[in-house]
Structures are given as structure tokens and as C-alpha cells.
From Swiss-Prot:
SUPFAM superfamilies, per the entry: Metallo-hydrolase/oxidoreductase
Family, as annotated: Belongs to the UPF0173 family.
Recorded superkingdom: Bacteria
Name of this chain's protein: UPF0173 metal-dependent hydrolase AZC_2841
Amino acid sequence: MKITWLGHAAFRLDFAGTAVLIDPFLTHNPVFKGDVAEVSKGVSHILLTHGHSDHIGDTAGIVKAAEAEGRKVIVVANPEVCGFLSGQGLSAFEPMNTGGTVKLDGFSVTMVRADHSSGGDGSNPTYLGNPNGLIVKAAGEPTLWHLGDTDLFSDMALISEIHQPKVAIVPIGDRFTMGPETAALAVRRFISAETVVPCHYGTFPLLVPDASGFVAALQGHSAKVVVPNSGESFEV
């Protein structure tokens, strides 16, 4: 599996001839320096953890650009987010919710708990369902857990026990999610992954600017901490 960090909580996964995007907040993401068309090339699915604009991001634009090329990109999200995006002209969805699993073309996605909120922006925000983390599984590939936006909770241990993730993508930015020390505690205490990737930091002034505190808090822990630059890929 090749994992590419696109800044904030956005990632591209390439595995077994499949390419998916998670939370593709790109155009208005100051950390993303790439080209939206390039990073979405060949993508078959977009997986969304929740309905905040810094996670839905470029979903509608990517799907419509693919349709103009004769390709279909399917959005995997909770029903409320699917409904919201249908109002933007999208029609190809795999709706699901917390605890459920959807089997797709050569891989599966399971939604798991995240402690956060989920709604549209503005003075009268739209309710967009519950936030979630995502478990991505494919035969012969390491299981990946994108935690979404969340605080620490002890049932992370149960999620680890059930799904046995080898890779965990963990928010560390503080204020809106766990901060570095709490995220490191989650990894030490509850998350069994062999490889840990921090995200949701350095995007805006309100967030922790870098991953150094997270890395320091995990010194001596068995998990490998990978801190890619925006646009950088690594393989697991």
C-alpha cells in the first residue's frame, strides 16, 4: 500500500490497482501544494469521515471532473453527508454509518466511532450526521485506520482488537481534536498499529504547527512514526 499525505487529514491510498482519497480538502488547504487533477487521477472512491468543510473539501469538484471524463467516482460517507452532496449534483454513493461495513471493488470500509462533531459551516450550520473513523481493508494489504477527527476514548482498544490495524492515521492538532500528548497516549495505551502517521496539524494558526511533540511523546514506543511532508508518499 502506498500512502500519500496531502496535508491536513487528506490522504491518497494506492493498493492492488485501486486508488482512493480520504477527506480531500485540497483547494483551500494551505499545506497542499499539488494539483487536484493530478492527485485524483484514477481514483475510484472518496471516503469521508464527517461533514466539516475541511474534510468534504473538493469532493464535488473531483467527482464532477471525473464524470466529464467518463469516469465514475463513488463517495462513501454517512447518509447525511451523502444527502448534502446529492444537493450539489452528485449521485454515486455508498451510504453507511458507525459500525457498518461496505464491501467495494477489492476492498472494504468499516465506519467506527470518533468523538467530534459534524455539520455544515456558517451561521446556520446543517446537521450532517455523526463523525466517524474509517477502517480500510484489502486482501494482502495492511489494514489502515484513519481515526478522523477525534479525542481519545478507551474503546479505541476494542477497535484495535476487532480490526487489528497495521497503520493508524492520528489527528494531533489540538483545539478541535486531540493534541500531541493525548494522541501519543492513545497510541501507547489503545492503538495497536505498527505504523503511526500524524495528521490534522500545521494547516491553520489555531492548530499545533508541527509533529515534533507527538514524535517526542512516542520515543521508545514500538510503533514506527512516519511524518511525511505534504505530497510525499511512503509504502507499508
